[in-house]
């Protein structure tokens, strides 16, 4: 290879690709057919960092049989990334292995869930010990682990957030938080941002404001959307707005301690309060950083003023920490702390159990009592001994291995490296995030900020997978790549991931030029 592209590829230390991937095989033949990555248009890939783990030999269903069963017996709503879905077999720390033994760097961690690494030995050991001791009792009988875990978790939250309700998923946690807010306030209306994702239950669908999750059926009575203070796509935003090492390319004349964008978005929030809800409201839900919408950050100071306005109307403020909690943002253990606010209710899931089904709602004694006066709340599996054993081990690993600090250091390192790609490639419109919660928004061009067509984003996504990197998708048009690896990720692994992404962008530009 000669010319500018050859020089660029050589500078990335790229080498011939030896990874093999499955050819699209929805014809369901008796065996899977295989093709080299050169059939995908890829000729080179960055060198993977070493891994001192050998996966077990895959001995389960044939790939073609998996596709057949999926088509016949699993709901069609169970969709997968890529035309030839990965059949994953084993995990080790940051790595995943498919049924052919191919290795992938997991930079999405099961949708921001595997917080301390796949099959962490301490978490595994805790689960194995409890498996031989006691699986389930329900909350009508006491067991020590739920009490030990509640004490550990509440110690990580500021006063007066000290009462813990354990459930099984983020949707369940937000469902319960909605009940608490309405029981405590004696009001109905709850506000959430456009672009918010708070769950897919019939109740939380009212809070979720992403079109693909909406149905033409009654749901979420009393839920009111409000403008998301999105400083990249919204009407206001500039170069000092975000709490991030990387700012938007939009320019502004604001002084560093003054944000006109924040003031304008607060006026929109006031307008919602004045026109769209009752004089007394039940509450306001907010993710500290929007996840499903593509890692959207708000102007600094916005949530603090919004919380004050909600409380003036008698509402409670709920922080949805399902994706942002447990040290992922680096500078603080909880996302709400990065906004200098104190919520009345905090919901959490995903990283709480490193992939084990577990979630929690933490609130104040007064709000907890309000629910008790209204109803008997019961959850069969919430707080079961297995979940509490796993959850306790996860908290211990985060502390012992300094994973919050690692999120800050390695996340900042990655953001700054990705920002250089934004400056280099016209189709990389924005790089944003904090710690190990990062978004890369793909655009037609930086001036229009219009989303890159889905088929082009799909191809870049697929090319990354072909080179051994798994990343997520988000945004209203699926135009944003979401990066949220386990918090034990290292700088050499970041270097590999950034080189892969850059190579995928180069491949895309070569295709465009043909």
Curated annotation (Swiss-Prot):
Pfam families in the record: Aminotran_3
Compartment annotation: Mitochondrion
Protein name in UniProt: Alanine--glyoxylate aminotransferase 2, mitochondrial
Domain of life the protein comes from: Eukaryota
Cofactor(s), by name: pyridoxal 5'-phosphate
Keyword annotations: Acetylation, Aminotransferase, Mitochondrion, Pyridoxal phosphate, Transferase, Transit peptide
Gene: AGXT2
Enzyme Commission number(s) from the entry: 2.6.1.44, 2.6.1.40, 2.6.1.18
A biological-process GO annotation: N(omega),N(omega)-dimethyl-L-arginine catabolic process
Subunit structure: Homotetramer.
One function term, GO molecular function aspect: beta-alanine:pyruvate transaminase activity
Family, per entry: Belongs to the class-III pyridoxal-phosphate-dependent aminotransferase family.
InterPro entries: Aminotrans_3 (IPR005814), Aminotrans_3_PPA_site (IPR049704), PyrdxlP-dep_Trfase (IPR015424), PyrdxlP-dep_Trfase_major (IPR015421), PyrdxlP-dep_Trfase_small (IPR015422)
Catalytic activity: glyoxylate + L-alanine = glycine + pyruvate; (R)-3-amino-2-methylpropanoate + pyruvate = 2-methyl-3-oxopropanoate + L-alanine; 3-oxopropanoate + L-alanine = beta-alanine + pyruvate; 2-oxobutanoate + L-alanine = (2S)-2-aminobutanoate + pyruvate
Residues bearing PTM N6-succinyllysine: 71, 262, 304, 417, 420
Protein function: Multifunctional aminotransferase with a broad substrate specificity. Catalyzes the conversion of glyoxylate to glycine using alanine as the amino donor. Catalyzes metabolism of not L- but the D-isomer of D-beta-aminoisobutyric acid to generate 2-methyl-3-oxopropanoate and alanine. Catalyzes the transfer of the amino group from beta-alanine to pyruvate to yield L-alanine and 3-oxopropanoate. Can metabolize NG-monomethyl-L-arginine (NMMA), asymmetric NG,NG-dimethyl-L-arginine (ADMA) and symmetric NG,N'G-dimethyl-L-arginine (SDMA).
Cellular component GO terms held in the UniProt record: mitochondrion
Upper lineage: Eukaryota, Metazoa, Chordata, Craniata, Vertebrata
Residues with N6-acetyllysine modification: 71, 262, 417, 420
Modification N6-(pyridoxal phosphate)lysine, positions: 350
Residue span of the annotated presequence: 1-41
């Amino acid at each position: 290879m000669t010319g500018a592209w050859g020089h660029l590829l050589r500078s990335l230390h790229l080498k011939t690709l030896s990874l093999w991937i499955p050819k699209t095989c929805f014809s369901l033949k008796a065996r899977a057919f295989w093709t080299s990555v050169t059939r995908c248009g890829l000729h080179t890939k960055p060198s993977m960092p070493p891994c001192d783990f050998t996966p077990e030999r895959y001995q389960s269903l044939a790939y073609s049989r998996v596709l057949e069963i999926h088509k016949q017996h699993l709901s069609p709503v169970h969709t997968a990334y890529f035309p030839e879905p990965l059949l994953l077999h084993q995990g080790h720390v940051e790595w995943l292995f498919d049924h052919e033994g191919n290795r992938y760097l997991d930079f999405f961690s099961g949708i921001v869930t595997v917080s301390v690494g796949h099959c962490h030995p301490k978490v595994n050991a805790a689960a194995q010990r409890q498996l031989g001791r006691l699986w389930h009792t329900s909350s009508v009988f006491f067991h020590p682990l739920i009490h030990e875990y509640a004490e550990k978790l509440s110690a990580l939250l500021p006063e007066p957030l000290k009462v813990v309700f354990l459930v099984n998923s983020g949707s369940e946690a937000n469902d319960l938080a909605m009940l608490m807010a309405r029981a405590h306030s004696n009001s109905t209306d709850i506000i959430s941002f456009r672009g918010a994702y708070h769950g897919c239950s019939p109740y939380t669908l009212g809070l979720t404001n992403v079109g693909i999750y909406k149905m033409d059926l009654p749901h979420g009575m009393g839920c009111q959307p409000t403008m998301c203070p999105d400083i990249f796509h919204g009407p206001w935003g500039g170069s000092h707005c975000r709490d991030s090492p990387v700012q938007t390319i939009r320019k502004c004349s604001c002084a560093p301690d003054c944000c006109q964008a924040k003031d304008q978005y607060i006026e929109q929030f006031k307008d919602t309060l004045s026109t769209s809800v009752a004089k007394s409201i039940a509450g306001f839900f907010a993710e500290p950083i929007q996840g499903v919408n593509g890692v959207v950050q708000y102007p600094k100071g916005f949530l603090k003023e919004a919380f004050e306005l909600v409380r003036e109307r008698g509402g409670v403020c709920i922080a949805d920490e399902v994706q942002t909690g447990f040290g992922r943002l680096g500078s603080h253990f909880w996302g709400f702390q990065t906004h200098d606010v104190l919520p009345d209710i905090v919901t959490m899931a995903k990283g709480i159990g490193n992939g084990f089904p577990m979630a929690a709602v933490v609130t104040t004694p007064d709000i907890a009592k309000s629910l008790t006066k209204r109803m008997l709340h019961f959850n069969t599996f919430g707080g079961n001994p297995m979940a509490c054993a796993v959850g306790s081990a996860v908290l211990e690993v985060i502390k012992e291995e300094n994973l919050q600090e690692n999120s800050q250091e390695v996340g900042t390192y990655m953001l700054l490296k990705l920002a250089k790609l934004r400056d280099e490639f016209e189709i990389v419109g924005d790089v944003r995030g904090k710690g190990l919660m990062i978004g890369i928004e793909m655009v037609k061009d930086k001036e229009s900020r219009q989303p890159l067509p889905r088929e082009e984003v799909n191809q870049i996504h697929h090319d990354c997978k072909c080179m051994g990197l798994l990343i997520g998708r988000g945004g209203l048009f699926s135009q944003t790549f979401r990066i949220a690896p386990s918090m034990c990720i290292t700088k050499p692994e970041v270097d590999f991931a950034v080189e892969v992404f850059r190579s995928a962008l180069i491949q895309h530009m070569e295709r465009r030029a043909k």
